[in-house]
Design a protein with these regions (language model features):
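Short His-Asn-centered micro-motif
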Residues: 73-76, 97-98, 133-139, 158-160, ...
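Short, surface-exposed basic-aromatic patches at helix termini and helix-loop junctions that form
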Residues: 86-90, 145-156, 247-249
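Conserved beta-strand scaffold positions in the cores of enzyme catalytic domains, especially
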Residues: 95, 155, 227-229
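Conserved phosphate-donor/acceptor-positioning beta-strand/loop module used by diverse small-molecule
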Residues: 146-172
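The conserved 3'-phosphoadenosine-5'-phosphosulfate
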Residues: 220-294
């Protein structure tokens, strides 16, 4: 059977995975494949092998309007994967975690691919239930374009207060490597705040990235009327309330019994990115305490950096705290 462009835009079985130059790469998926794919980047677990390559120019000629889509935007290492997986019902709505194509757009020109990508991501198996997209740090910098295109879409900004963010981002060599890489990649967005980025310390990079994201969220909140904020510490401390509110916000049909089962089950007792590893909130807090003394110099430096920009930081946080996710 020959696929048409209409088929590609209609069925989630044809997943726009990434762009390779002027070519869009589709991989075969089904509902089970989406559910088991914790991430939809290189770690995707497709329904079968193989890929379909289609010229981007052909797809852009006839982009349909995106269907209503919910968004989880986050600062990284803050429980976003846990929240997204908790909202994912294998028999109901789709939750797309960190689509590779969307991430790529954060580093490319505004050439029509965002409309193409959001239309492809908005597909669903059940028309009566929402599709939710969980972004990543680079996709935060698409927010001006996303908000302009879909100002009515429901969105959650999952964030951490500065000190908790620093604990999460600076706690290991691997996390610091990630921080250096992503801030270098996003240099045009965060480099101006700290001058010569290649000379910046890890603490300065972390502080600059945190502030840039807080300001993006605050600016977007003024455009997207259905945007709400969620302090990740509140999510970790009371996941039942947070998950109940998130499900209601996105229109995900989770009953109180289903929510209690998820919060009390394996999902919240294992590492969200690796279900084979036991990990809960108590482990997270213990890890935080273990690194507090080790990070004291970095914490002080980052907090001084933010203190010099207190007006911007306080304004952004005040805006977010004025739109809390609530049941």
């Amino acid at each position: 059977m020959t696929l048409t462009l209409a088929d590609l835009y209609a069925s989630p079985d044809h997943y726009l995975h990434s762009f390779d130059g002027d070519t869009a790469v589709f991989v075969p998926m089904d509902r089970a494949a989406y559910h088991r794919s914790i991430f939809l980047d290189a770690r995707i677990s497709p329904a079968e092998d193989g890929a379909l390559r289609v010229p981007v120019a052909a797809l852009i000629e006839s982009i349909p309007a995106s269907l209503p889509t919910g968004w989880i935007m986050h600062v990284a290492h803050c429980g976003s994967t846990l929240l997204a997986r908790a909202l994912d019902d294998a028999d109901a709505n789709l939750v797309l975690r960190e689509p590779q194509a969307l991430r790529q757009l954060a580093f490319g020109p505004p050439d029509g691919r965002l409309a193409l990508t959001t239309a492809m991501l908005s597909k669903r198996y059940r028309p009566d239930l929402p599709t939710i997209v969980k972004g990543n740090v680079p996709t935060n910098f698409l927010l001006p374009r996303i908000s302009a295109a879909t100002p009515d879409a429901p969105m959650i900004f999952l964030y951490l207060p500065l000190r908790e963010y620093l604990f999460a981002i600076l706690r290991s060599d691997n996390h610091r490597t990630w921080l250096r890489n992503v801030t270098t990649q996003l240099g045009k967005h965060v480099g101006g705040a700290i001058g010569a980025l290649h000379n910046a310390s890890d603490a300065q990079r972390a502080a600059a990235l945190w502030l840039a994201q807080m300001q993006l969220y605050a600016d977007t909140a003024g455009i997207m009327v259905n945007a709400r904020s969620l302090d990740a510490e509140m999510f970790f401390a009371d996941p039942t309330t947070a998950l109940t509110a998130a499900a209601a916000h996105f229109g995900v049909p989770l009953s109180p019994r289903e929510i209690e089962a998820r919060v009390g089950g394996a999902l919240f007792a294992t590492y969200s990115k690796n279900p084979a590893q036991s990990f809960g909130n108590a482990d997270r807090l213990a890890r935080r305490n273990d690194v507090e003394a080790e990070l004291s110099v970095d914490l002080d430096e980052a907090e001084r950096w933010i203190a010099a920009r207190e007006t911007e930081a306080s304004s952004a946080l005040a805006t977010l705290r004025a739109i809390p996710l609530a049941v």
